[in-house]
A protein has these predicted regions:
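Lipid interaction determinants
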Residues: 1-56, 62-109
């Protein structure tokens, strides 16, 4: 579990509160099932790396459990963010796109 999240007591699949969304996103590198990684920074930038090819985007928090991800030139999506908790420890996040329902699960490196 990332050190910055150790004080939180949350359940698996629980929506991430607005107060904790930035901390959840920036707690560490997320690794997805296909090996892609994503890093969020506190200044609202994000880098998604797939097969060694990085792409840069931006993100911002909307409210409880929701954030927006923008990828130039024109892709924007809103996601609901939920905790992944294993044996009482926060191990990652799930992202569900609000418009299409696509779900992605990332685990902290």
């Amino acid at each position: 579990m990332p050190e910055t999240l150790q004080e939180l007591r949350v359940g698996n699949d629980e929506v991430v509160d607005a107060d904790h969304t930035s901390a959840a996103l920036t707690a560490g590198t997320l690794v997805f099932g296909d090996g892609a990684t994503q890093v969020f920074t506190s200044d609202g930038h994000t880098t998604y790396t797939d097969r060694g090819r990085p792409s840069q985007g931006d993100s911002w928090v909307l409210g409880d459990g929701k954030f927006v991800s923008f990828w130039p030139p024109d892709y924007q999506a809103t996601y609901v963010v939920r905790w992944v908790v294993t044996e009482g420890a926060i191990t990652g996040l799930t992202f569900t796109e609000t418009e299409r329902g696509a779900r992605f699960e990332g685990h902290y490196l």
